[in-house]
């Protein structure tokens, strides 16, 4: 089956949705870039399944659109068109607006999520050829988008976030839900077995696997644990990292050690000390 070309979706969006349905995501590749600074020209190829098409444009996004458009035409010619007016799981009005930023905002409000946050991630190029990269953050997810203006970059980031949500949902209808929210204050009232054990356990015992201990507590309470390695060594030449707990507010603790693994264990130890302190308060 081939994707329906509806007026409220871009060729890139339609091809992405079709890729989800056939379990083969479109892959874009920059073939070459030429021209001068005032008239650049880019050529991209897109491959989906056994189909490969090319597109040319004055921007990378335009070239990708042309490639996706060519792939859609080829798929349409070879297959019967299936109507896809699902509007990303939102109301018809939201889909028809073709405004990714507005669609994402409405989705967050409907699901009672935190509203999307947009942060300028990078700014490159001379004054007349600026390119902005903006990160869109939503419920623990992050996607970036680029454009010749902040508005276009923000739109691209929102578009990519919607595509990410569709991918996590396994279809063009967004059914994904963020992990349950665990508020730091709620730790005081926890009666879980692992938390109760933590309250009674000294955190100064040698050769303790604090990483495993933190994992068990996170599974009991329902928050996620993410370790972030820091490239720079400490002044003493030790590895260092951060551990982030998806609590509300987010909890971040630092750790360092003679190896990366030791740094992770130290960060987990510090996070456990914090959890123990909060859980023991009355």
From Swiss-Prot:
It comes from the Eukaryota. Keywords: Cytoplasm, Repeat, RNA-binding, RNA-mediated gene silencing. It is found in: Cytoplasm, Perinuclear region. The keyword Ion transport does not apply. GO terms for biological process: regulation of regulatory ncRNA processing; siRNA processing. InterPro entries: dsRBD_dom, Ig-like_dom, RLC_Component, Staufen_C. Pfam families: dsrm, Staufen_C. Residues 10-77, 99-167, 209-277 form the DRBM domain. Activates eif2ak2/pkr in the absence of double-stranded RNA (dsRNA), leading to phosphorylation of eif2s1/efi2-alpha and inhibition of translation and induction of apoptosis. Required for siRNA production by dicer1 and for subsequent siRNA-mediated post-transcriptional gene silencing. Does not seem to be required for processing of pre-miRNA to miRNA by dicer1. PANTHER family: INTERFERON-INDUCIBLE DOUBLE-STRANDED RNA-DEPENDENT PROTEIN KINASE ACTIVATOR A (PTHR46205:SF2), LOQUACIOUS, ISOFORM B (PTHR46205). Belongs to the PRKRA family. Homodimer. Interacts with dicer1 and eif2ak2/pkr. Also able to interact with dsRNA. This is Interferon-inducible double-stranded RNA-dependent protein kinase activator A homolog. It comes from Danio rerio (Zebrafish).
